[in-house]
Amino acid sequence: MKSSDLKEYIRKELDGSKEKKIGVVLIKPEDYREATIIISEYFLSRLKLKGIYVTLNMPYYSILENLKKNDINSSKLYFIDCVSKQASGFKNIKNCCFVENPESLTELSLAITEAINTGNFNFLVFDSISTMLMYNDLKIVERFVHYAINKLRSYDMDGALLFINDEKSKELANVIMQFCDKFIAL
């Protein structure tokens, strides 16, 4: 999909309701990076919200660079990074919490809960649920994501749960969709 078409389509799908909503976003691999930028831009710039960005497949600093290249102010984002600590070490960063790895669901759950409990955030982007399937059993990921969705609802937060459009992820997305308000296929 062309860049401008992708942006217009995502905005159209996310717009329309003033109510808080949680959505499953199924993304083609070739559109993945651009779609994550567009979704972040939507919440940060268009809606002017503060949010949590959980990353399981790229270090937070790579996401920061991508946002900066696209003139998106990331100062209202808090990152939960499940990559950097395992890959290359980490530093204490004010707007980032480091989780051991994508397999550490208890640690990830605690980090998400701690961030949400501050009451400072309006949305959460989960990038990507598909990566969790590489490290964890399908049923465990289903339960974890259901827990996360309930946590978002209890704090009246928006959420974007990102999936790669492949067979294994589709199986999980089909289960998770029943707990969500919106389904977007790119």
Label the predicted regions:
Residues 88-144:
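Phosphate-binding/switch loop-helix module in NTP-utilizing enzymes
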